[in-house]
Amino acid sequence: MDFPTISRSPSGPPAMDLEGPRDILVPSEDLTPDSQWDPMPGGPGSLSRMELDESSLQELVQQFEALPGDLVGPSPGGAPCPLHIATGHGLASQEIADAHGLLSAEAGRDDLLGLLHCEECPPSQTGPEEPLEPAPRLLQPPEDPDEDSDSPEWVEGASAEQEGSRSSSSSPEPWLETVPLVTPEEPPAGAQSPETLASYPAPQEVPGPCDHEDLLDGVIFGARYLGSTQLVSERNPPTSTRMAQAREAMDRVKAPDGETQPMTEVDLFVSTKRIKVLTADSQEAMMDHALHTISYTADIGCVLVLMARRRLARRPAPQDHGRRLYKMLCHVFYAEDAQLIAQAIGQAFAAAYSQFLRESGIDPSQVGVHPSPGACHLHNGDLDHFSNSDNCREVHLEKRRGEGLGVALVESGWGSLLPTAVIANLLHGGPAERSGALSIGDRLTAINGTSLVGLPLAACQAAVRETKSQTSVTLSIVHCPPVTTAIIHRPHAREQLGFCVEDGIICSLLRGGIAERGGIRVGHRIIEINGQSVVATPHARIIELLTEAYGEVHIKTMPAATYRLLTGQEQPVYL
């Protein structure tokens, strides 16, 4: 490309060493207010000394405007012209990837035109080079300030995240964030190159009722829309609380039995991106939720409850900053295959998470190998009660000679942290009930200083009978409720729970498994699973609920003998 010839003063352009060091040009130490282009004293000249009048300068600007956008460097044998010097193209190749401004090769033509038009330039500053400070970047807030702009739920806890992604759900949105001017070229930790991604095995089919390819495009289920309601909830309540919220939403919307229930025929569109509610006739979107805003899905019989999260518009008080509340939009549907729809939504989440891992350059086979720091935290209801010194007490009973204590005892269950007798019932009007200090579920650890821990039930009953001839008895107990909550941390449905159930009663337990560590005991009857009562539930349904449960599984149990006594299936034997 030919460049126009520009008349110069006899002094010529500034002499420059093309083989000099490749650092950014450092201005003179003599700070003068004339111009930042002034040379050192005695120098050969500079751009500011060029004898260009106003007409020549205007002609130079017009010539530069006529040039194409991409300036190529001059021939190696020729001297650089002022335009190349100003844009950096006339210099030897320099490593200026981290430099930004009018002297960098990345500067646009508009910046250079502004330089040529300006009459006075501020003096340059000298000093050691300092790293560039992050420049503020104004982000565009979402159209709906009430809409939750969280990152997808499957992103949380991943070992590598997309660059620049931030979760704005846990703090107020200061839309002004600071980012570095130069994007680092090094890939984030854990990210893999495209060649490495190509070596990964193809993603396995996520188990579920739908085909993986169909979920990518979207699957439609028929249902009847009953209505919607709103609840206020914390961000991540336990599963039992979610289930209770789903039941509350169903009770609000669903008409009582015997009354007419207004409903609308709709189609539920489920994909790995969104969940939509479409009218059955015109296929118009009644509701449209991004998949990552769906917090919980519950199938209660033939009723399906879909819960989507939206952040409240008001700002919480400073003292409530750690407890941000959210609007839960609860949509209630009636469908014969409600359970199938709930499983399809869960499959869509799993497929979207698998797709996110591959797009983020994370080897799916390595996910879950290294447990998170909080994964080792285990909850045990018995341990909570036993470790509380307020629950350990001594009870003094006064009675008549020859009178029994008036308690019925059962075993605590194999695998219990405190293997001893449990008070299953109290005789009305007996010494134990009269004291008012004993209740059903209390663990009996000692009688008159004699320990009962570890003894079989028959030995414990014999020790109680021996107190019949006494008028004063001292009992050592640990106060416990009759129903114990076991929380099992099950990462996925493929992991073994580690116990067997027969007619709702736990009959065997894997020693050291997640169930035993969570508080499951042999001989206990399951009362509730994730907030859903299973007292009158068939055995097959209990197995189904346990098989599908994963994550944080809440199971309430009580000794089977206590359950039979309380429900009148057996008559208690008072001691």
From Swiss-Prot:
CDD domains: PDZ1_APBA1_3-like (cd06720), PDZ2_APBA1_3-like (cd06793), PTB_X11 (cd01208). GO terms for cellular component: cytoplasm; dendritic spine; perinuclear region of cytoplasm; plasma membrane. Keywords: Acetylation, Cytoplasm, Phosphoprotein, Protein transport, Repeat, Transport. It holds the Pfam family PDZ. GO terms for molecular function: amyloid-beta binding; enzyme binding; enzyme inhibitor activity. Residues 1-10 have a biased composition (Polar residues). The keyword Ion transport does not apply. Residues 156-184 have a biased composition (Low complexity). Residues 143-153 have a biased composition (Acidic residues). GO terms for biological process: chemical synaptic transmission; in utero embryonic development; negative regulation of catalytic activity; protein transport; regulation of gene expression. SMART domains: PDZ, PTB. The modification N-acetylmethionine is found at M1. InterPro entries: APP-Binding (IPR051230), PDZ (IPR001478), PDZ_sf (IPR036034), PH-like_dom_sf (IPR011993), PTB/PI_dom (IPR006020). The keyword Protein transport applies. Residues 215-364 are annotated as: Required for interaction with NECAB3. It comes from the Eukaryota. It is found in: Cytoplasm, Perinuclear region. Binds to the cytoplasmic domain of amyloid protein (APP) in vivo. Interacts with HIF1AN (via N-terminus). Interacts with NECAB3; seems to mediate the interaction between NECAB3 and HIF1AN. This is Amyloid-beta A4 precursor protein-binding family A member 3. The gene is APBA3.
